[in-house]
Amino acid sequence: MVVEANKKELICSFCSKKQHEVKKLIAGPAVFICDECIDLCMDIMKEENKVALKQITSSIPTPQKICTILNDYIVGQDQAKKILAVAVYNHYKRLEYIQSGNNEVELNKSNILLIGPTGSGKTLLAQTLAKILDVPFSMADATSLTEAGYVGEDVENILLRLLIAAEFNIAKAQKGIIYIDEVDKIARKSENPSITRDVSGEGVQQALLKIMEGTVASVPPQGGRKHPQQDFVQLDTSNILFICGGAFMGIDSIITARTNNSSIGFAANININREKNNSEILQALEIEDLTKFGLIPEFIGRLPIVTTLDELDKEALITILTKPKNAIVKQYQKQFELDDAELIIENSALEAIAEKALAKKTGARGLRSILEHLLLDSMYKVAELKKHRVTITKEVVNGLVEPIMTSLISTKSNKKQPVLEYIPA
């Protein structure tokens, strides 16, 4: 409520100092605030930022410890884990260095680009890193983004998701991680600069440049376009770590064409008879390949750390099914246990499931849908029957027979079967 001294002189709504006692008095909707109160607010916010950062940086595990934790949840991808662990560790150590006030050497932010086939673990790597570091994490799909003014999501909505994840704690959000998936889908349509509008390709890359590099962005707390009169939240993106991921289908042919052109004369005959797989080809990735694919040089420049993920083979998929802490088979066995039932999946069945996922080219992402389809009828029945054991064999996976259901009450031994560990033949 605005209070006036002697019906004339305005006063600060917070400290009650009169207008002539302060240097500035700033008016707002039905309130006034003086320059001294603004300075006090700024000091409080700076102190809160220091506390928030100290909580994050004081508990940063070393790169080796980060890798050890990642190994509990993610199978394979050792090189990608190592690169990510070092990058994330250095990023948060950089924040600690900046907060200390030491400006002797300016440390730049290093965002990350993950390249790998569908279901190779790009999203899971980013999610697990955020969980390890206990920082706000948000994920966005690049395919839904468009330039401002066109139908689709504005890039500022990515920052809004991070704010929501941080419960609108701005200081905490400014130290978070943003994962932008399907970034290969915003590649421009040709290698040459676009003459006409490319609102979902090159236009989105241009829009992402500033927030990825570091800027104070105006974030609409209620979403962008439906509430034009809302007050905006100012969010500094300078210390937000951006991780971009994509399958980049077809980039292997760009790499192959480049490497073949570079091999002439006698060098062309070396390894000509050895067919390289997709993972080996990606190891030879260069910046120029990304440019030819359709990423603009400025966008690539904001992603100095580039790492590739290997395509998962049959053994890796079986390990994903059984080994990690949150392995898919363990999850389904726990669900059956909640219904007082047991689930047994034979080794031959695990192999058949992995082969199906490979045939569908869905990687680890396809394993859950295959199991869900196999176990649907069993889960439907055991909820009523209770005290039953469901066994999945290779024949069940191949659709030749139904899952085998046996009553635990009628069997001589009611001992719970241990979780099966896959042992290759």
From Swiss-Prot:
The keyword Ribonucleoprotein does not apply. Coiled coil: none annotated. One of its GO terms (biological process) is cell division. Zn(2+) binds at residues 12, 15, 34, 37. Pfam families: AAA_2, ClpB_D2-small, zf-C4_ClpX. Keywords: ATP-binding, Chaperone, Metal-binding, Nucleotide-binding, Zinc. One of its GO terms (molecular function) is zinc ion binding. Residues 1-53 form the ClpX-type ZB domain. Gene3D superfamilies: 1.10.8.60, ClpX chaperone, C4-type zinc finger domain, P-loop containing nucleotide triphosphate hydrolases. ATP binds at residues 117-124. PROSITE patterns: CLPX_ZB (PS51902). It comes from the Bacteria. The keyword Chaperone applies. GO terms for cellular component: HslUV protease complex. ATP-dependent specificity component of the Clp protease. It directs the protease to specific substrates. Can perform chaperone functions in the absence of ClpP. HAMAP family: ClpX. Belongs to the ClpX chaperone family. PANTHER family: ATP-DEPENDENT CLP PROTEASE ATP-BINDING SUBUNIT CLPX-LIKE, MITOCHONDRIAL (PTHR48102:SF7), ATP-DEPENDENT CLP PROTEASE ATP-BINDING SUBUNIT CLPX-LIKE, MITOCHONDRIAL-RELATED (PTHR48102). Component of the ClpX-ClpP complex. Forms a hexameric ring that, in the presence of ATP, binds to fourteen ClpP subunits assembled into a disk-like structure with a central cavity, resembling the structure of eukaryotic proteasomes. This is ATP-dependent Clp protease ATP-binding subunit ClpX. It comes from Rickettsia canadensis (strain McKiel). The gene is clpX.
